Amino acid sequence: MQINYRYQLTPNITQLLQDLEVNRRLIDLLPSLPHIEHHLRRQSILKSSLFSARIEGIGNALPQDASKREISNILSAANWLYSHSGPRRLNITTINQLHGRILRHLSPDAGQFRSQPSAIFNQAGVAIYFTPPPPQIRELLSQLIRSLHSSIPGPIRASLLHFGFEKIHPFLDGNGRVGRLLSTFILKQAGYDFRGLTILEEYLEAN
């Protein structure tokens, strides 16, 4: 498996990028109200955590205590991304730290790449995609990170990262949750997180 994803800026995508840029600039022009923004961001992160859990079916298949822990961990990981002690750049360490926070007290493999083969199954239990073997994970992730050039528009970088990360599927569990937070991290770095007030997971669940 090689990381060599290509994309094409169609008229529709170009228009969407322009719309995002207009909205970003409009929000940047708004006066900063730290107290109100902090409250709204807290509500937004909480909703993002709940929608992220719903995307994965958490709450339907887990005991109540485990379900609460899953949601609490997602919330903690999202808060970490926005904290002063959060990561400053995307690298292997950031990915492992995110996974460690998301699977904290839920899996002995929290923060560790999988050491066995894995596959993606459909609802009928049939394997529809076989993930790369464990020895290739670290190098494939490094390739993916290197491919995200700063010349690529931020929203597209976030999409490429999410797509590539899920294809590599570096962990036995939690890949979807980590992938969505990594997308949020890229958008934040590129200035497209809209001050942390948008709920990406709500859109993903609906579409």
How should each PLM-predicted stretch be described?
Residues M1-N207:
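FIC/Doc superfamily catalytic core
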